[in-house]
Structures are given as structure tokens and as C-alpha cells.
Amino acid sequence: MLPYPQIDPVALAIGPLKIHWYGLMYLIGIGGAWFLASRRLNRFDPTWTKEKLSDLIFWLSMGVIVGGRLGYVLFYDLPAYIANPTLIFEVWKGGMAFHGGFIGVMIAAWWFGRRNGKSFFQLMDFVAPMVPIGLGAGRIGNFINAELWGKPTDVPWAMIFPPFSDPAQLPRHPSQLYQFALEGVALFLILYIFSRKPRPTMAVSGMFALFYGIFRFVVEFVRVPDAQLGYLAFGWVTMGQILSLPMILGGLGLLWWAYNRPQPLKNTAL
């Protein structure tokens, strides 16, 4: 069994002001995405300036934050937020849903593309390889917060999370780290390598949706579902799996359509 590193969720306190690691992870993810996007900008569109890229990253970040929070409220704990709406603003305590953030990003990309002469999938293909940076950083934030841990296990790398998070004090799968490895590192490598060669429009987006959906669906088998939801069917189906299944099917559909519709191969290497 591995010891859980006792990390204070508050990274820095200045008087009454507290800066949480969870929030810093979002900043690291956004900064990392901007850095990679700036390195690939000329291959995407030589006419775009760094200022326009910064505008894109800003609106996508707003989509992630607003969509992620509203997605958690709607998909995972709507009754609690109806009873106490002020909880919606306590984002430092966690409670963000990737699938809601993904919808927020799609809306922001569609809106920004319309204003800047880019199609929805041109922007999504450009953005997709950057997303795992934010996903990986977010999972580290979950780990520091000692939230979203896995089921009890006797594997050598099991961890006992703090009593405030897990009163049962059982050795558990560190599922946040599994998701960091799959949704962060592995997905980044897949998309980075895949997007280095010219691909038809929608192909990179399809790869993102397919592999994120697969990775999330698999990890859900060892991750404890949110207590207020539990398992939704057959004693093992979780909300995360239900929301990931359309991504898997959608990713397959996008890849099939990208490579089978009648169009020339476009030089969209990123």
C-alpha cells in the first residue's frame, strides 16, 4: 500500500484570501493549453495573431468553467443545488463535470468560429490535442482534494484517503491518478501524434471523443460513483459511463464520416 501524500488543499493563504490547489490546476491547464496552441498556431492559420488565440482560449476556458459547473449541477446533484443555490459558486470545493465542460467548449467554439471565419470542426480539431493538458491537471486537483477516489482494493498501490474524505479508512484505488494517466498523459500523446500528420476535418475531434469516452468508461468500473447517485442500472452502470457512451459512438461516427465523405485530404496537421 502506498501512503497518501497529505497535501493541504489550500496552496497559499494571504489573510482571508485562500488560493486552492484545485483552482491552480485549472490555471496550469489553461496555461499549458495556450502554450501548446501558440506553438501550433502558424500551422493552423498563419493569419491568426497571439491576441486572437488568447481570445479563443479565454472563451473556451469560460465554456469549461461554466459548462463544467452547470453540468455537475444538472447531471450529478440537482436537488442539493435547488435547495441551496449558493453552493453553485463554491467551485473550490470541487464539483465539476467533464461532460458539461465539453458541452460548454463546443458552444464556445461554435460561437467563436462564426465570428472568426472558422467552422466548428476546424476549431475543435485544433483545440482537441490541448484538452488533455487541462484534464490531467484537473485530475491532480481531484487527488489533492482527496475526492473521486476508487473502490476498496488490495492492489500494492492502494491508498487510504484522509478521514474527512473517506470515514471508512479503506485502502482504495487512486482512480484520480488512473484518470490522470489515461485522460491526461495517454490521450495527449494519442492526439498529439495523430494530429502531426494531415488529417481530414473531424478526424482529430473524432479521436478525442472516442478515446476519452473509452478511458472514462473503463475507469468508472473502479471509481466510486457520487454518493447521491450511486449505480444507475444493473448494479454497476454509473452516470459517467452513461455520459461517455455517446462520446464513444459519436467519435466512431466522426471518424467514419471524416474518412468516407467525398472530400480531398486537407492539410490540417497541427
From Swiss-Prot:
It is found in: Cell inner membrane. Pathway: Protein modification; lipoprotein biosynthesis (diacylglyceryl transfer). Keywords: Cell inner membrane, Cell membrane, Membrane, Transferase, Transmembrane, Transmembrane helix. The chain crosses the membrane at residues 10-30, 56-76, 92-112, 120-140, 174-194, 202-222, 236-256. Coiled coil: none annotated. GO terms for biological process: lipoprotein biosynthetic process. Catalyzes the transfer of the diacylglyceryl group from phosphatidylglycerol to the sulfhydryl group of the N-terminal cysteine of a prolipoprotein, the first step in the formation of mature lipoproteins. Belongs to the Lgt family. NCBIfam families: lgt. This is Phosphatidylglycerol--prolipoprotein diacylglyceryl transferase.
